[in-house]
């Protein structure tokens, strides 16, 4: 044995000595020093960036480390090296590690914040770890970039926190164009993807792997053990567009979208958690397009989305689809998943649209139903019975349903061979995890290669005692999936804006504009009764509430600024609540408007119990501006030339200017044009956005000068509900023209001398693809 | 050591004993015995079929052998077990071997002759070896079958001889529909694929792997070390339609077609031989569609095909192509191949058809040029200089040309970066193999993963001394690629019909019909001068020549059979040469016609120095009949209602009735309709067939009753040449309407009082897909 040891040691030394190791550590404090250190680095080098703010820094990390001796670029103290301004980081070489940097207060001057390529020099075996990218948005939402852009092979993004992207482009993208970037085995693991607000249009995925044009490539990207929290950018949280990607052990927490196999085939979706919210229909699950995907051991809780956003959406394809549209689903396996308290969790033939053949070309008709697919050994549990746990939007003969079980609390549903109602109970292991209280005795179907499903959700072996559903063993320990210390960096703690609001009293003697400018994030400005004259637009770039001190004796704000300027100028990140006030113009101004450009983030606006009058526009959203929430509640809007205009996105590429618009208990009187004008253009079945609720409101003497003759213009908006309103003496042709095929509804409206409310089933829109 | 040995022996015995071995051999002589033996078989069983003819036998070989102890079904003597009549063979199970059977004189009653599946029971690890399938055709060419149909995984077809398929359907097909049949690693190795005649339309590949609808699947089929000899069925000899297939070491000998990566990606085409013929433009090479294929170490000699049939055709794709059309070429590597005496061997953007945008929909326009592809380290050698060794049908900026060399004997050509004219010599190693006489000193380009090209054409290592071209070492030994003992069975020898012709003298006293019926294959019937009266159609089902004994004193045959019956009835395999005769009808009969149905094989007809008169039709080809060669030389056709009609395929699916039609030195006089009527319908860019040559002939007083007003109607025929003819006093609108975009030409014709000869560039045809 001794001899062997000596030989092994000698061998080790021999191998080790072949490679010149550099264990030196060099600290750099300026860009020039950093550049020099990179140029001088050799395997084993450590470059330490000094704490502090690095402004306008473009790191070009070129080098060649080795597997045992990588070259490392790290923060002196993780999180205390701030990269801001026009900055980015690009890798070119092998075995390079970046550790502990913090990107904030800036944006990339290039197409990416972090990229695994410099010109044609693609990175391999490189790593970004323990870093943060936060709100590093380009100035306008139509300026595209990626925050992390993969090329090459075997690169890793791990233990990072990434949040707040609002401009166009997926947060993370894997590029596959070129043989150097296929079979990449990249790893995106243990990250925390924090909130991404809705973009109001396409191209806002959190992760996109490939594009349709490279969807034939073998990718083998692993996305595992990440937390996706409120990733609401668009309908796809993850868009897999290549072959052999794997999605394992991720937690999708209240994220408005789905994990979608959009293009490409043979992906594995195993052991993920999808956690919804009782009231949120935007939170989806898994949406399947294409061939050979295996969806196993997933746990889906409280998901209420439908159709494209169903807990499981197995789509119809377009026969012989072109490369960038919808491939037929074939050879898919959905096995050993659990759906707990989801609404109609299993939906097949989603996107079936034969009924739209008159408004769409044949190449857009999804009539190819799923075939040669197996749905087996799944478990559905409902605390309250579901009348349609399985929804067939088209024929489902191509699907082999085997040994699925449901506890539907006795509620009847359309029976289906292979879905058996049985009685079993579930225990809450934690708030979000329910596991069967007893071993479920139902037989397990053994399909082709089902022996490869050898572990359950918790990684326990299925060999000895297999069971239907995602969990085999009732005696499991809490895996703490929402413990945020398991994801992201070891230093960043999410900045929870305190809800303790500073209250600032303002009287007529004060300068209201200054008070607002000086106020802290989240402040409340409380106005004494009286009249406040404003002569210049007040910029709103933070969260702020302006209200009357005494709601029974409202203050009045009179705006006398320039024509076509707003009293309140909504800046990026501006969140204004206006409450119990009167706001008056002089007929030529706007009450509220976004910036005309550089809306790098969204704004929100809430108006309650106010009276707004004598403006040219009540609200004008300029092109490229976006608001997640706009609401007018209990307010009066009167004597204005225009009302609420959110219709500046006229390119018909699916973009729109606001996600949620709510009008409740309001009175609109003598609003002459664009009473409500809310627009989304471009045919894209997967867009699920734009929401307008108009209820319990009255509209009178409005629309006299409206060119298109429609009082509430909602063209192309997907979700519209108009109910319990009264329309009196509005000289228009139509109160509204609703889109029947989408989620457009109306009820209990009283219409007198105001035109008709018409529903058109299939709206003709411009094709986007 | 002794202990170890004992232990190993014990272990072996233990493992061996776990599996019940059956070394028994059972001989069977009847279908019932065979069925019983199969039912009783266990691992190791050998079932021996008795020599003799087995008629109408449907073998269902179900069983479960093991890797070490397969179940074998073998001929008592290989080749002496004849399977004939309505017979087929299907496998269902594991580790089953069939050895030595001979399928002939029959056809499959099912969709396949040999199939690796019985109902839903797919075969795995099964083998067909040392068998022959010969002329086992269904009765009509539109009746589809496959002769070997793969399903499941790890099945093998080896050392078989397979020839003579003329009905619709690839000879061998691999099916990939269903997860059980993907990643199949089937092996098609060491076979001899003998002649397959042209089918006259699509679906006559020798091997097809998958279909477009399963083209996203990983297939991994290996096609290696096979000989393809005169595989002329259609434009594709091998049609690869799935991913990761490998084509290695095959010999394509004078086969009219190409190896095509029609759908699917990442195939390997390595070390194959493509051997052409000086004068045959139908013999192609390698045609590339799709992504990521590697074409390396191939040797291509004497190939004269162009465009779709070029020695290397890299195609243009359709942007965002639908699943069944043409994908763009991307990420392809063409390296270390040798083209010797090929015409314009490297063609890029093949199929570019923007010029046809007026007659084709956008979804048929191939405008997507090859991108991200590398063409490097290839060698071109021309004994006679080639002015265009590289043809760019569209832009070639997407291709990286590196370190390619050409010896063009000083002939200038369009220069191209990356193709260097240098001087080097080649030696003939054998008739068909030329290797460099000296080591070529040119630098080798090292592209991405080029280190995987570690061997050359002959399997010699490239590690020590790499070189441009397919061969690294000048000192190589003949690998005898055309030694037929290397391919196919160990018992079958190809039946070369002797060219020693029996001469049979016939006088007016003899019964001509009986003499013809009795004649051997290849006989010559020589007629004394005089008149021969025939009252019934004479069937021609073999190779036979009928001629006058004295060409200066021609015999006359008068046919007085029923109206609309032919003097000579062309049966399957009928090959008639008629020479120096007069053939006369009584106005209502046909001189020649095919069978009306059951044309299970083609017929050929050659008429020289004859006078044919007073028929309703000279030649009538019925629907589903097909002739490879029809020629009229030095003959007179006169006073007939119709001439030569080969236009029965009116379904517009690309089929046609004859491959080669030649009219030379003939006189057509008073042929009133369908003077020549030759038709192919259906738009399919890859169809290259139908050939009509009309030269040095005269046409007078013809076409008076022709409805369409065209004398020589060649609608849809790809190759037409009309030259040096004289057209006089033919009352038609057009002599011919030629298709300019195809290979239709005319020259030196004299046209008097006979309408015009018009060329239309883009013919409007029915879309087939």
Model-inferred region functions:
Chain A
Residues 58-60, 85-90, 104-124, 134-423, ...:
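Glycine- and acidic/polar-rich repeat regions and solenoidal domains
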Residues 423, 428-508, 751-769:
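Surface beta-loop-beta hairpin patches that serve as ligand-binding interfaces in beta-rich domains
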Residues 1-24:
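Bacterial Sec-dependent N-terminal signal peptides
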Residues 29, 326-328, 449:
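Short sequence motifs at beta-strands and strand-loop junctions characteristic
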Residues 45-49, 404-406, 465-470, 523-527, ...:
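Extracellular beta-strand repeat scaffolds in secreted/surface proteins
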Residues 60-69, 118, 476-487, 540-546, ...:
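Short, compositionally biased
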Residues 22-29, 51-113, 133-137, 507-510, ...:
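Right-handed parallel beta-helix/beta-spiral solenoid domain characteristic of secreted/periplasmic
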Residues 18-56, 60, 66, 458, ...:
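Acidic Gly/Asp/Thr-rich repetitive segments characteristic of extracellular carbohydrate-active
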């Amino acid at each position: 044995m001794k001899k062997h040891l000596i030989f092994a040691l000698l061998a080790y030394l021999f191998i080790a000595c072949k490679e010149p190791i550099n264990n030196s550590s060099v600290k750099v404090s300026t860009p020039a020093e950093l550049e020099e250190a990179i140029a001088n680095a050799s395997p084993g080098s450590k470059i330490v960036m000094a704490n502090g703010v690095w402004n306008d820094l473009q790191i070009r990390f070129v080098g060649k480390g080795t597997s045992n001796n990588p070259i490392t670029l790290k923060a002196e103290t993780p999180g205390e090296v701030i990269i801001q301004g026009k900055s980015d980081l690009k890798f070119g070489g092998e075995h390079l590690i970046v550790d502990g940097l913090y990107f904030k207060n800036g944006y990339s001057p290039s197409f990416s914040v972090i990229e695994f390529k410099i010109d044609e020099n693609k990175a391999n075996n490189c790593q970004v770890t323990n870093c943060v990218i936060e709100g590093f948005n380009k100035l306008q939402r139509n300026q595209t970039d990626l925050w992390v852009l993969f090329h090459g092979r075997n690169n890793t993004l791990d233990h990072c926190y990434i949040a707040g992207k609002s401009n166009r482009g997926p947060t993370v993208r894997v590029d596959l164009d070129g043989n150097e970037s296929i079979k990449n085995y990249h790893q995106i693991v243990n990250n925390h993807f924090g909130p991404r607000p809705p973009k109001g249009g396409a191209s806002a995925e959190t992760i996109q792997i490939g594009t349709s044009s490279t969807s034939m490539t073998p990718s083998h990207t692993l996305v595992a053990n990440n937390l996706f929290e409120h990733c609401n950018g668009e309908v796809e949280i993850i868009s897999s567009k290549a072959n052999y990607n794997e999605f394992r052990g991720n937690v999708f927490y209240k994220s408005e979208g789905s994990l979608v196999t959009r293009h490409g085939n043979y992906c594995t979706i195993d052991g993920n958690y999808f956690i919804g919210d009782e009231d949120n229909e935007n939170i989806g699950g898994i949406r399947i397009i294409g061939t050979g995907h295996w969806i196993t051991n997933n746990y889906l809780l409280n998901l209420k989305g439908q159709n494209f956003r169903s807990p499981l959406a197995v789509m119809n394809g377009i026969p012989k689809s072109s490369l960038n549209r919808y491939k037929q689903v074939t050879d898919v396996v959905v096995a050993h998943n659990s759906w707990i308290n989801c609404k109609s969790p299993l939906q097949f033939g989603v996107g079936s649209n034969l009924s739209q053949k008159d408004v769409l070309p044949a190449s857009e008709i999804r009539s190819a139903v799923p075939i040669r697919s197996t749905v087996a050994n799944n478990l559905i549990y409902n605390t309250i019975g579901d009348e349609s746990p399985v929804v067939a939007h088209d024929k489902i003969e191509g699907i082999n349903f085997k040994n699925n079980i449901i506890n539907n609390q006795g509620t009847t549903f359309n029976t289906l061979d292979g879905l058996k109602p049985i009685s079993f109970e579930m225990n809450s292991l934690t708030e979000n995890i329910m596991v069967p209280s007893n071993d479920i005795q139902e037989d397990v179907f053994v399909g082709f290669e089902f022996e490869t499903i050898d572990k359950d959700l918790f990684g326990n072996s299925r060999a000895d005692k297999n069971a239907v559903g995602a969990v085999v063993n009732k005696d499991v320990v809490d895996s703490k999936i929402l413990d945020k210390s398991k994801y992201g960096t070891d230093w960043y703690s999410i900045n929870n804006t305190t809800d303790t609001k500073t209250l600032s009293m303002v009287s007529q003697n004060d300068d209201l504009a200054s008070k607002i400018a000086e106020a802290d994030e989240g402040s409340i400005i409380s106005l004494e009764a009286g009249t406040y004259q404003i002569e210049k637009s007040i910029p709103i770039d933070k969260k702020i509430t302006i209200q009357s001190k005494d709601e029974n004796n409202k203050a009045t704000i009179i705006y006398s600024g320039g024509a076509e300027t707003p009293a309140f100028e909504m800046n990026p990140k501006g969140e204004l609540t206006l409450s119990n006030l009167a706001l008056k113009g002089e007929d030529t101004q706007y009450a509220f408007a976004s910036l005309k450009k550089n809306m790098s983030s969204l704004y929100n606006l809430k108006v309650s119990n106010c009276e707004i009058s004598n403006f040219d526009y009540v609200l004008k959203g300029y092109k490229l501006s976006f608001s997640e929430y706009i609401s007018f509640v209990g307010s009066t809007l009167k004597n204005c030339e225009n009302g609420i205009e959110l219709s500046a996105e006229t390119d018909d590429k699916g973009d729109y200017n606001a996600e949620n618009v709510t009008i409740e208990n309001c009175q609109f009187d003598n609003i002459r044009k664009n009473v409500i004008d809310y627009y989304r253009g471009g045919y894209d079945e997967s867009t699920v956005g734009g929401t307008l609720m108009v209820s319990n409101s009255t509209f009178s003497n409005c629309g006299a000068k409206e060119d298109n003759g429609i009082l509430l213009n909602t063209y192309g908006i997907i979700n519209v509900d108009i109910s319990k309103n009264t329309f009196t003496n509005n000289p228009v042709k139509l109160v509204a023209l609703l889109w029947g095929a989408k989620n457009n509804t109306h009820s209990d409206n009283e219409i007198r001398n105001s035109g008709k409310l018409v529903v058109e089933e299939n709206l003709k829109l411009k094709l986007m693809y």
